[in-house]
A protein has these predicted regions:
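Amphipathic, charge-rich alpha-helical segments that serve as recognition/docking helices
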Residues: 1-77
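Accessory, typically intrinsically disordered or conformationally flexible segments
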Residues: 58-63, 69, 73, 80-204
Length: 204
């Protein structure tokens, strides 16, 4: 059976129907899936003139009965998650982490620290973005092998043991609120990173 090719208009109508049911209706999807639907609707217009893109935003919010503030908030979260999925920690993403990304985007001080661009939904400060992702993820650090003079000359150590896994510094959305309190204090951030402890950074 040949694949049916939908026009852009048909695809948009389908997304609106799904949105009425799963965003505005009584069979609501998870925040992530709601955000994905909104993203999918607007994606074809992201390189269009700004006026055309805003018109499609207005069409979407009027059809679904949601506010533009809610629409853009959900798009920020979805796009930040997509950036995480492109990072070195992509395989660690789980739906349970969505609340963390939501809280990040609620904090203007964190958005500023990331150099967040609300027009293109991306972080211009790539170094800080990578640091942030490392705080909410398990990471591996290199461990120097311990010299053992009793070993016979020529013995090789197992390269697989040279790295140790560290647990995430931040695992809960509420912890993002504490992070926002000292995100602009580089000394406190360094303490947090060195100690792998949000609490230690908070009191530094």
């Amino acid at each position: 059976m040949p694949f049916e090719i939908h026009s852009k208009e048909e695809s948009e109508k389908h997304l609106i129907v799904m949105g009425l049911k799963h965003i505005s209706g009584n069979k609501k999807w998870s925040t992530f899936n709601q955000s994905k639907l909104l993203y999918d609707f607007l994606k074809p217009y992201e390189k269009s003139p700004r006026e055309e893109y805003i018109n499609k935003e207005n069409e979407l919010i009027n059809s679904l009965g949601i506010t533009k503030h809610r629409l853009r908030s959900m798009l920020r979260v979805y796009n930040l998650i997509q950036l995480y999925k492109l990072s070195d920690y992509s395989e660690q993403f789980t739906p349970d982490m969505v609340g963390i990304f939501e809280e990040i985007m609620k904090k203007p001080v964190l958005k500023n620290w990331l150099g967040w661009n609300d027009s293109g939904y991306f972080a211009s400060n790539k170094i800080n973005l990578e640091r942030l992702f490392s705080w909410i993820s398990k990471t591996e650090v290199y461990s120097e092998p311990v010299d053992n003079e009793d070993d016979e000359e020529g013995n090789d150590y197992n390269n697989g043991d040279d790295y140790k896994e560290l647990e995430p510094i931040i695992t809960k959305s509420l912890e993002i609120r504490d992070l926002a309190l000292f995100i602009e204090n580089e000394h406190a951030l360094k303490v947090m990173e060195d100690e792998r402890s949000l609490a230690r950074g908070l009191v530094s």
